Amino acid sequence: MLSLDIENLTVAFPGLSSPALAIGRLSIDAGSRVAITGASGSGKSTFVNIVAGLERTRQGRIRWNGEDIASFSESRRDRFRAANIGLVMQEFHLFPGLSALENVLLPARLAGAATVDVIERGHALLGRVGLSRPGQKIETMSRGEMQRVAIGRALLRKPGVIIADEPTASLDAESGEAVGDLLLDLAIAEGSTLIVVSHDQRLACRLDRRITFGSGLISEDSAAAAGEAA
């Protein structure tokens, strides 16, 4: 599992009068389960892109277990993300024509890391996410089943952190509830830190901590509130 420490982070985009994201300091302990909430345009997606290394910031430090990914080259960030971060997104980014298992294994195959053990883990993960037909083509699956495949893919390389961006937003209520429960249960079982961006209040309430963004700033943090109350 990975811890996250952010210091003096500012993300600005051309044409905007104020930063899209500004965080003076934020720490997330290894093994934490954290909900990221806030209105549209509050900075949540920028936060995900920055901490996952999908975008680079030129101002601030983003340390995963002490490694500052803000200082990495793009190729090094990509390698770090592949080895340490499992991503589950609202859009599943699965490939039609490939089976559930082939989609789970695809990133490992592209990285030349699809060993026998990894393939066996792929099979096992599909069972753990509730899918009994690894050879089933993606295009024949429901959206809830597709998200289960995406969760299996995210867990394949035993990531230290799982980052999920609105993982239940495109699902119906029943499927969303099942996928949310599955994501949390698997993160606990795997020992992964979990960061979930979500408007799903039921899912957010199951997590240990809630951080709310507004206009690119942290407007509320349940951990800080708990510390003040103590």
Predicted regions and their residues:
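A short, flexible loop at the N-terminus of ABC-type nucleotide-binding domains that lies
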Residues: 1-3, 11-24, 74
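Helix-to-loop junction immediately C-terminal to a conserved catalytic motif
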Residues: 52
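Conserved ABC transporter NBD signature motif
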Residues: 60-68
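Conserved ABC nucleotide-binding domain
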Residues: 125-139
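Conserved ABC ATPase signature
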Residues: 137-147
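Conserved catalytic motifs of ABC-family nucleotide-binding domains
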Residues: 158
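Catalytic Walker B motif of ABC-type/P-loop ATPase nucleotide-binding domains
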Residues: 162-165
